[in-house]
C-alpha cells in the first residue's frame, strides 16, 4: 500500500479562518468520494512546536494522508470524476501559484515496534473517532553519499525505546510519478522534495521535549547530523478526521 502526503499551507489570499472553513466543511467532504481510496486522515500543525525544532512558524499548516493500493491506483483516481472534483476544488480555492503548490509525496512505510506502544492499531483494525496523540513528522533530503537506510536499520531498535514513544514509522519516498490529464505531473516537477519520512508519535509536545532531551534522542539527532542529514520537523495534532474504506472497522470512543 502507498500513502500519499499533501502538505497544505494557508495561501496569502485567505485568512486562517477562511482556509479552515473551506477545508473542513467543503474539501474533506469531496475528498471522501475519491475512487479507490483506502484510508484518509488529516492532521494540523500545533502552534507550540517541540523545543529542538527551533522554528518560529510550523513547516506547514496541514498534512493530509491518503492511502491507495499503489501509485497507478492514485493516477486512475485523479483522472476520474471524483479525483478531478477534489483537484478542481483545491485549485479554485488555494490557487496555482508556485508558492501555494502543495508538496506531494508517495511514501512506502515500515512500522517499527516500540516499548510503550498504544493499545490499538492506528491505521487498521480499531481506531478512535477523535483526534489523539501528537505526531512528530521528520522530512529528510538525502545527500548523495548518505546511506541512511543502513544506518536507520541499526538505529531503529534503540530509537524505538525512546521514552514516551507510542508509534514509530519509517517511510521511503517512491520515485514514481503520475500524470493527470495532459499537463500535470505529480510530484510537481517530477521529482519529490524529500527522500524519507519519519513519524514518531507521542502523547504530547511536552513528551516529545522530554524524549529528545534524553540520551536516545540526542544520539539520534547526532547520528543524522554525522550523515549530513538535517530533517525538517513538524509536530501535528493527529487524525482530526479518519475515514476508512471499506467501512468495516468498529468505532471506539
Q: What function would you assign to each model-found segment?
A:
Residues 1-253:
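Macromolecular interaction modules
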Amino acid at each position: 500500500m502507498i500513502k500519499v502526503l499533501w502538505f497544505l499551507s494557508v495561501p496569502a489570499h485567505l485568512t486562517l479562518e477562511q482556509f479552515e472553513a473551506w477545508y473542513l466543511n467543503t474539501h474533506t467532504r469531496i475528498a471522501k468520494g475519491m475512487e479507490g481510496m483506502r484510508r484518509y486522515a488529516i492532521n494540523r500543525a500545533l502552534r507550540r512546536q517541540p523545543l529542538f525544532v527551533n522554528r518560529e512558524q510550523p513547516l506547514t499548516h496541514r498534512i493530509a494522508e491518503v492511502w491507495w493500493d499503489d501509485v497507478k491506483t492514485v493516477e486512475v483516481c485523479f483522472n476520474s470524476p471524483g479525483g478531478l472534483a477534489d483537484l478542481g476544488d483545491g485549485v479554485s480555492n488555494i490557487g496555482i501559484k508556485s508558492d501555494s503548490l502543495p508538496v506531494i509525496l508517495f511514501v512506502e512505510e515500515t512500522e517499527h515496534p516500540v516499548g510503550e506502544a498504544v493499545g490499538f492499531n492506528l491505521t487498521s483494525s480499531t481506531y478512535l473517532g477523535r483526534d489523539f496523540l501528537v505526531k512528530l513528522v521528520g522530512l529528510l533530503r538525502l545527500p548523495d553519499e548518505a546511506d541512511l537506510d543502513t544506518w536507520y536499520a541499526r538505529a531503529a531498535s534503540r530509537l524505538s525505546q525512546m521514552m514516551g514513544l507510542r508509534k514509530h514509522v519509517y517511510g521511503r519516498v517512491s520515485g514514481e510519478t503520475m500524470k493527470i490529464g495532459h499537463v500535470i505531473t505529480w510530484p510537481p516537477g517530477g521529482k519529490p522534495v524529500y527522500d524519507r519520512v519519519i513519524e514518531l508519535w507521542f502523547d504530547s509536545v511536552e513528551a516529545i521535549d522530554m524524549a529528545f532531551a534524553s540520551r536516545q534522542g540526542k544520539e539520534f539527532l547526532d547520528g543524522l547530523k554525522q550523515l549530513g542529514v538535517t530533517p525538517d520537523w513538524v509536530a501535528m495534532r493527529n487524525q482530526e478526521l479518519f475515514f476508512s474504506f471499506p467501512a468495516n472497522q468498529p468505532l471506539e470512543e
